[in-house]
């Protein structure tokens, strides 16, 4: 499916089109060949090139960053200088390609221009890129970074409720690979947090919303990582709970759940986005969020919690009845 479904809310509070960023992780292609694939797809100018990373500046699109997803290797390459000039770093880079995924970080694009990325995934596939299902030890995936329509508490709370009501269903909708489920990288929110989130029908103050999240989720390893967005609002609170310099403040959600199926000819980034689209739409339905939250709490059983399979089946039927799935 190559059509990106458009959400009901396309613009932010300033009237600007919302932006979406994608990060794609894969193996099977060297860093050098990945860069070449991008250059063969768009008119690109290389910048900041090392043996572990390269930025490609593309007119009318922005900067696509290509890098080996290994913090140590990237640091060593930066210290060595320009692209492939240090033999030791270059050798290490080549060895890393066997086990370390290449990551392509796309620039944030206006929500109506996401189809500009379709040629990229096709070119990477032709170059030999392999996605989630090709590794038993690595949890390759696609990350989606949609800008939040507004940074007020009510808006963020509704997105959190929408995702939380759907998180089990989303795992099934994406057919998340067992290897990825077994890691901590895409852990779901704990049920204790969901019960707290659903226990009121009025949005908490922003400081309380952030504090509640950090209390239950003091980690980057969540399927919907809110730390970048909350850091944009209150960086000190986030760093106090999760002192990690990899957290970059930005007014976006960081959705990490989808597989990367780049080696499949019938897959594109639209497949991943169109599942997230369901979260977008549910987040705009205040009354439905209230009703579904109450229903979830009614289903809670002492010690056992909510029965997952039953809830997934209920949500799947509800979404179909409301033309959201």
Predicted regions and their residues:
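Active-site palm subdomain of RNA-directed nucleic acid polymerases
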Residues: 126-135
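Catalytic palm subdomain of template-directed nucleic-acid polymerases
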Residues: 147-149
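Structured core elements
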Residues: 143-145, 254
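C-terminal accessory/tail domains of diverse enzymes
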Residues: 1-102, 108-122, 126, 151, ...
